[in-house]
């Protein structure tokens, strides 16, 4: 292969690359010694700079490493042959960054596949400390690396030519290049985390991975919309929480715990992983009291969650974890607020449930009528602009409403959340909408609550959580009755447009580069995620109220709360 013309060599490799991608389990080329051939090409690429920079040879290391990764993806036999052929040393050279981030991407992919099998993992584990450190660094800085070296270069003619050709396969302009670069950067991060998972799941390098700075980075790693099938950072955090030393390190990081708690109250597909992490930490008596103060505040809203995906009795498991030592006199809780929350959980899940078991159908129907009357009173107060009275009435209705009347309670919680939004109390709005979504069947399916929680999260500056709820709202909105062919609401489109910019994979890297540039020019920088104009521009989305006759009265009354004349009435009560 090394003796033929470089253009022919690249043509042959690109053909082998396609075959390996489309037929990764075909034994023909692995049996003919393709791995030894790839090893010789990789060694030449990493050790002979003048050779790799000669003409088309620059494409060789990418194709060679990609071919190794494709053939070892699903086959233990091929993985063992690759290791015996000596693929690990040259792949490590690529992982070290000897060439560029493009080659690091395919190197970490191939090493991740080799680490997936027990027999080949041991050979890689000889370099354990270096591999783990390199991979942690790559996972943390890949967004900055790709942004600074590729995406931030606005003139496509100034970008590295072979990077552009590999990323877009020769098609598309600046927009396509940026979109594919985001996808590749996200893959680098996800594949790096997969490689770290292979060590962590075997109980290896836990203390090394649990570096506090890396844990903070890990908690913010999100596969995003381009890699929605990857659990990303939370997947590795959950694996760490299955080990005693991992739980101890995780519990010591306030930022990580808050991130896990936020995930547990979101409509993210990985919500259950956040809940799992908190339950593991609460069941360990060495970490329980380090996280209970924060976790109880969030988990209180999830105690009635019945089913989440394939997981059943989720709320019951949460309740048991929170009340482990509440009534046996062994609790070490000294903080009044935590004690209040646990008492509230006990009253809701134990006392009230026990009392309602013997409630007759006639009594239940009587309660339903009374609750509906109170709800109507609250609605009238709301439309008259008396938000404080409306909150009091919704609260009264919730206290009276039996747990069995789930639909009524969903409406009461969601309507009270709307009131909290109007008085600028997003924390209470998130709490109430989460409770409504926990009661809904299936979980996280009540459209109005999704929209209201999306707004509340936006007000708190939590773009990712807001985006997830907004997307779920649109999904619920358009699937309610497909025959009606409802159009997606404009206000939801406006919300998503803003949130997509804030949750862009390179948003942090762009902000950091911009701040460094501003700092060097005038010494001023800003870390605010949202500007005041953005906040007010989105918060004041005007929606058409359902009850028009009170529209002007509502506008007049809402001015008391500092709202503009056209304050929105989001998904009206």
Regions found by a protein language model. Give the residues of each.
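Alpha-helical tetratricopeptide repeat
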Residues: 1-573
């Amino acid at each position: 292969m090394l003796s033929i013309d470089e253009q022919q060599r690249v043509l042959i490799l690109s053909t082998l690359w396609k075959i390996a991608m489309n037929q990764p389990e075909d034994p023909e080329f692995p049996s003919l010694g393709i791995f030894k051939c790839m090893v010789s090409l990789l060694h030449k690429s990493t050790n002979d700079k003048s050779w790799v920079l000669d003409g088309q040879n620059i494409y060789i290391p990418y194709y060679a490493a990609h071919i190794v990764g494709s053939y070892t993806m699903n086959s233990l036999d091929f993985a063992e042959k690759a290791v015996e052929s000596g693929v690990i040393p040259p792949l490590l050279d690529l992982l070290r960054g000897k060439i560029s981030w493009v080659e690091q991407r395919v190197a970490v992919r191939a090493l991740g596949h080799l680490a997936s099998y027990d027999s080949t993992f041991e050979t890689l584990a000889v370099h354990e400390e270096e591999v783990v450190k390199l991979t942690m660094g790559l996972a943390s800085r890949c967004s900055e690396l790709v942004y600074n070296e590729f995406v931030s270069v606005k003139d496509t003619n100034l970008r590295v030519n072979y990077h552009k050709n590999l990323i877009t396969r020769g098609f598309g302009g600046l927009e396509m290049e940026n979109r594919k670069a985001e996808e590749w950067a996200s893959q680098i991060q996800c594949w790096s985390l997969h490689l770290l998972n292979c060590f962590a799941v075997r109980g290896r390098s836990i203390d090394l991975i649990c570096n506090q700075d890396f844990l903070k980075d890990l908690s913010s790693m999100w596969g995003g919309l381009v890699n929605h099938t990857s659990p990303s950072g939370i997947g590795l955090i959950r694996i760490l929480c299955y080990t005693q030393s991992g739980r101890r390190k995780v519990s010591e990081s306030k930022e990580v715990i808050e991130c896990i708690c936020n995930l547990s109250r979101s409509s993210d597909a990985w919500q259950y992983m956040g809940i799992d992490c908190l339950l593991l930490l609460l069941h360990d008596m060495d970490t329980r009291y380090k996280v209970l103060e924060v976790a109880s505040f969030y988990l209180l809203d999830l105690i009635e969650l019945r089913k989440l995906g394939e997981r059943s009795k989720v709320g019951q498991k949460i309740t048991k974890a929170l009340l482990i030592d509440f009534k046996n006199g062994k609790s070490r809780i000294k903080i009044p607020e935590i004690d209040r929350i646990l008492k509230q959980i006990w009253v809701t899940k134990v006392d009230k449930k026990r009392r309602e078991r013997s409630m007759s159908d006639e009594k239940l129907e009587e309660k339903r009528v009374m609750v509906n009357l109170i709800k109507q009173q609250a609605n009238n107060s709301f439309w008259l602009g008396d938000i404080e009275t409306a909150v009091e009435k919704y609260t009264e209705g919730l206290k009276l409403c039996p747990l069995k009347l789930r639909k009524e309670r969903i409406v009461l919680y969601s309507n009270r959340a709307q009131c909290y939004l109007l008085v600028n109390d997003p924390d209470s709005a998130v709490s109430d909408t989460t409770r409504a979504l926990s009661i809904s069947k299936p979980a996280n399916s009540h459209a109005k609550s999704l929209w209201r929680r999306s707004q509340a999260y936006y007000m708190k500056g939590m773009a990712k959580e807001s985006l997830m709820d907004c997307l779920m709202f649109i999904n619920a909105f358009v699937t309610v009755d497909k025959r009606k062919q409802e159009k997606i609401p404009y206000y939801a489109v406006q919300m998503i447009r803003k949130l997509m910019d804030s949750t862009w994979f390179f948003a942090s890297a762009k902000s950091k580069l911009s701040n460094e540039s501003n700092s060097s020019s005038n010494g001023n920088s800003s870390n605010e995620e949202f500007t005041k104009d953005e906040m007010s521009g989105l918060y004041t989305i005007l929606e058409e109220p359902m009850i028009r006759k009170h529209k002007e009265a509502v506008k007049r009354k809402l001015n008391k709360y500092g709202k503009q004349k056209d304050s929105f009435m989001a998904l009206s009560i």
